């Protein structure tokens, strides 16, 4: 069998990796080993932070919703309103409720009154 020289293939692979790391600083964009390590680290960080973003936004929605609900009624909390929301079988998630609370406080007031009136 003939010998296969992989110079062009290896160069193409490294060029592709370098293109991804061209935005990095210092040796992280110049040295192949470091580029590979930093690339893996970047992918791990991006995946981790995508999941973290979901948690952060849920926390933000809950905080905003709690503040809006407490402003509406005395002694009425976020947890009680979400519990009553599920009992009355209304299909509104936290994101939608928060958008309603920010844009139209009266609408949120009407929704919470309906939930309390149903008294399931």
From Swiss-Prot:
Q: Which GO terms describe its biological process?
A: translation
Mind telling me which Pfam families this protein's record contains? Ribosomal_L20 (PF00453)
Q: Does the keyword 4Fe-4S apply?
A: no
GO molecular function terms noted in the UniProt entry? rRNA binding; structural constituent of ribosome
Keyword rRNA-binding on this protein?
yes
Ranges that cross the membrane: none
SUPFAM superfamilies referenced in this protein's UniProt entry, alphabetically: Ribosomal protein L20
Q: Gene3D superfamilies, alphabetically? A: 6.10.160.10, Ribosomal protein L20 (1.10.1900.20)
Stored InterPro entries: Ribosomal_bL20, RIBOSOMAL_L20_CS, Ribosomal_protein_bL20_C
Localization recorded for this chain is: Plastid
Please give the GO cellular component terms listed in this UniProt entry: plastid; ribonucleoprotein complex; ribosome
Which key words tag this protein in UniProt? Plastid, Ribonucleoprotein, Ribosomal protein, RNA-binding, rRNA-binding
The family note in this entry says:
Belongs to the bacterial ribosomal protein bL20 family.
Q: Which NCBIfam families match?
A: rplT_bact
Q: What is this protein's function per UniProt?
A: Binds directly to 23S ribosomal RNA and is necessary for the in vitro assembly process of the 50S ribosomal subunit. It is not involved in the protein synthesizing functions of that subunit.
| Name this polypeptide is given | Large ribosomal subunit protein bL20c
């Amino acid at each position: 069998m003939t010998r296969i020289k992989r110079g062009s293939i290896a160069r193409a692979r490294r060029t592709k990796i370098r293109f991804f790391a061209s935005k990095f600083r210092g040796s992280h964009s110049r040295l192949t080993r470091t580029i590979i390590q930093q690339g893996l680290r970047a992918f791990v960080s991006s995946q981790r932070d995508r999941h973290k973003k979901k948690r952060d936004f849920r926390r933000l929605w809950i905080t905003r919703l709690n503040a809006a609900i407490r402003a509406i009624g005395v002694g009425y909390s976020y947890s009680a309103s979400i519990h009553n929301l599920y009992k009355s079988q209304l299909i509104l998630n936290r994101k939608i409720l928060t958008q309603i609370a920010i844009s139209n406080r009266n609408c949120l007031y009407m929704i919470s009154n309906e939930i309390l009136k149903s008294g399931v």
